Every structure is written in C-alpha cells, then in structure tokens.
Regions:
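Conserved alpha-helix/loop element of class I SAM-dependent methyltransferases that forms part
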Residues: 6-24
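A short glycine-rich, Lys/Arg-flanked "PGG" loop and its adjoining helix->strand segment in the class I
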Residues: 112-124
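Short conserved loop adjoining the S-adenosyl-L-methionine
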Residues: 88-92
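Short catalytic micro-motifs in class I SAM-dependent methyltransferases
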Residues: 101-104
Length: 178
C-alpha cells in the first residue's frame, strides 16, 4: 500500500504469524478487514480445514470489494464476511485475531473494552496481531514523523492535494495513541 510505510512487510508477516498460531477447530478474525489484504494473508496461513475465517468491516463498499478479491484467490478455505461494527461482533473460540490499522478508528474510551473482549474470546496459545499508527509525546518528534510520512506518500505517487484531502478526511476519526 502506497500510504503506509512497512505495510508490504506487515501483510506477509500476518500470514507467517497465522501459520504459527491458528488452531484446528478455532475461529480466526480479521477485524476491520477493509479490502481483505490481512484476510487473504490469514487464509493462506491457515492449514486446518476446520478453522473458520471471519472478516468484519462496517463499510458495505469495502465488504463488496473484499468479496471480489477473495473470489479471485485460489485458496479453498471459506471466508465469512460481515458488514458490522467490530465493537458489536460476537467473538468466540479465537486462535488468531487481527486488528491491522483498525483500533485507531475505535473511540479511545472504547478500546480497552474491545481488547478485553478479544482477550476473553482467545483460546490458550492464541494471538492478537495488532498494527497501529502511533503518536509521539514530543511535538517536535511528532512534527518530524508527520513530515516523513508525507514525504513517504509523495515518494509513492500522492500529490500534495491528495495528502491534504486524506489528512482532512481522517483528522477527527483516526486517533492514534502512543
């Protein structure tokens, strides 16, 4: 993905981690599945036919596009997609759960509750794969990181207008923590 540094490393690592932690007869969840990159990585990391893979996103458009990408994939493990708020998703018997740049869109006061629910639903030996943007306490460090991130986007083909529009669109929605 051209807007997130390290994303091209994160997705293959989700597959590797899923290979190590997916358990027979369990559920694997991709919470905030978007277009399905993490979902597909998890799918390829699951070696048990008895696993259920569930992708959840609150955007119908994202779910539709995710369905398209899943249909193009040649892996045989079925994927169940749900269009719902991840805070309302029923979780149980999980061996692998992924929050890939998703938690930052959950209101800060509701994050602990969601993480607790995930922990309670996770089987012994299971794992939560969490990828997030962070913010720095130092204003100077945060400003430097923001400049570097914008330069990364420019280097990957984004115009200044696109960068500005994206920043405006997510300013009050994406709330990273340290």
């Amino acid at each position: 993905m051209r807007r997130l540094p390290g994303y091209t490393t994160i997705i293959p690592m989700i597959e590797v981690i899923t290979e190590q932690y997916a358990q027979a007869g369990s559920n694997c969840y991709d919470l905030g599945c978007s277009l399905g990159a993490s979902t597909l990585a998890m799918r390829h990391g699951i070696s048990f036919d008895s696993c259920s893979l569930v992708g959840v996103d609150n955007s119908e458009a994202m779910i539709e596009r995710c369905e398209h990408y899943i249909a193009l994939d040649d892996h045989s493990l079925p994927v169940s997609l749900r269009c719902e708020n991840i805070q309302d998703t029923e979780l149980a018997n999980a061996s692998v759960t992924t929050l890939n740049f998703t938690l930052q869109f959950v209101p800060p006061e509701q994050r602990c509750s969601l993480l607790s629910r995930i922990a309670e639903a996770t089987r012994p030996g299971g794992v939560l794969i969490l990828s997030e943007k962070i913010r720095f306490d130092s204003e100077d460090e945060q400003a430097a990181q923001t400049r570097l991130h914008h330069e990364f986007k420019r280097a990957n083909g984004y115009s200044d207008l696109e960068i500005s529009q994206k920043r405006s669109a997510i300013e009050q929605v994406l709330i990273p923590e340290t």
